[in-house]
From Swiss-Prot:
GO terms for biological process, alphabetical: lipid A biosynthetic process
Family, as annotated: Belongs to the acyl carrier protein (ACP) family.
Name under which the protein is recorded: Acyl carrier protein
InterPro entries reported for this sequence: ACP, ACP-like_sf, PP-bd_ACP, Ppantetheine_attach_site
Pathway: Lipid metabolism; fatty acid biosynthesis
Protein function: Carrier of the growing fatty acid chain in fatty acid biosynthesis.
Modifications made to the protein after synthesis: 4'-phosphopantetheine is transferred from CoA to a specific serine of apo-ACP by AcpS. This modification is essential for activity because fatty acids are bound in thioester linkage to the sulfhydryl of the prosthetic group.
């Protein structure tokens, strides 16, 4: 597992108050991890801060799963 993937999963677990074991790549923030719209906004902000990147609103709306978050952050770090 890459460091970005590990970091993204750790942030998701912390922000959503779930166990790290629950944060699997295909997990949906809302359906599987119990996030609401405020949780997802706070999650995006935490990812932006941790990885020193900006996630435009139209992209943030597409980030609905753990894998989507990992993919976006990996692309932004290249």
């Amino acid at each position: 597992m890459s460091t970005i993937e590990e970091s993204v999963k750790a942030i998701i677990a912390e922000q959503l108050g779930v166990k790290k074991e629950e944060v699997v790549n295909n997990a949906s923030f809302v359906d599987d991890l119990g996030a609401d719209s405020l949780d997802t906004v706070e999650l995006v902000m935490a990812l932006e801060e941790e990885f020193d990147t900006e996630i435009p609103d139209e992209e943030a709306e597409k980030i609905t799963t753990v894998q989507a978050a990992i993919d976006f952050i990996q692309a932004s770090q290249q």
